[in-house]
């Protein structure tokens, strides 16, 4: 009985304290049809780039496939286009398949004669070198980098070709994501 009196007292008290509100304001916002469009955060963007790199490197049967995380962390650290380094490796060594044995140098860095302990060390060293010796000195485009990096006049157009391979793969993934958009 005491519990019943306490419950009734609480209900009566709440009824007197409660403030009236306009239900149409609340229902107006809650009744709208929402389209779920996630804000592309850095994590999502880099997860997509990781997938793109993995798919392209897998297609070329590249030994660099296990170094996708190094490509990504290097592009973030040195503020590079994430597809630049793998594209250079694509041109210079067919994505790491044609290198001096044991050199771990897929970029042709130092005319391909510089030896690295690992692919990851090569990726970081070349990324840092591009940032410090090319980009920080005014070479901002692939063409400007190419005029310093390589003696071939077609180097930049061939790097651009490989960068486009990665970008087209990213477009395919974007299409898949758009087709699977959720409407609430």
Predicted feature locations:
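Hydrophobic, well-ordered secondary-structure segments
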Residues: 2, 17-20, 54-77
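Non-catalytic cell-wall polysaccharide-engagement segments
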Residues: 2-28, 112-184
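An acidic, Gly/Ser/Thr/Pro-rich helix-cap/linker signature
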Residues: 19-49, 167
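Peptidoglycan-targeting cell-wall enzymes and recognition modules
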Residues: 37, 41-57, 87-139
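Short, functionally critical alpha-helical segments immediately adjacent to catalytic or ligand/cofactor-binding
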Residues: 69-94
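Secretory-pathway/luminal and periplasmic proteins that interact with or process carbohydrate-rich
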Residues: 81-83, 94-101, 150-158
């Amino acid at each position: 009985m005491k519990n019943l009196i306490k419950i009734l007292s609480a209900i009566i008290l709440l009824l007197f304290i409660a403030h009236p509100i306009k239900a149409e304001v609340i229902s107006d916002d809650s009744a709208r049809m929402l389209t779920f469009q996630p804000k592309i955060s850095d994590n999502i963007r880099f997860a997509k780039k990781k997938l793109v790199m993995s798919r392209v490197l897998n297609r070329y049967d590249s030994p660099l496939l296990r170094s996708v995380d190094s490509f990504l962390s290097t592009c973030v650290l040195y503020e590079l286009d994430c597809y630049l380094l793998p594209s250079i490796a694509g041109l210079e060594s067919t994505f790491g398949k044609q290198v001096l044995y044991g050199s771990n140098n897929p970029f042709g860095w130092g005319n391909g004669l510089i030896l690295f302990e690992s692919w990851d060390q090569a990726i970081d060293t070349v990324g840092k070198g591009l940032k410090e010796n090319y980009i920080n000195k005014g070479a901002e485009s692939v063409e400007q980098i190419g005029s310093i990096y390589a003696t071939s006049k077609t180097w930049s157009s061939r790097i651009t070709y490989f960068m486009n391979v990665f970008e087209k793969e990213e477009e395919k993934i974007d299409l898949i994501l758009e087709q699977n958009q959720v409407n609430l």
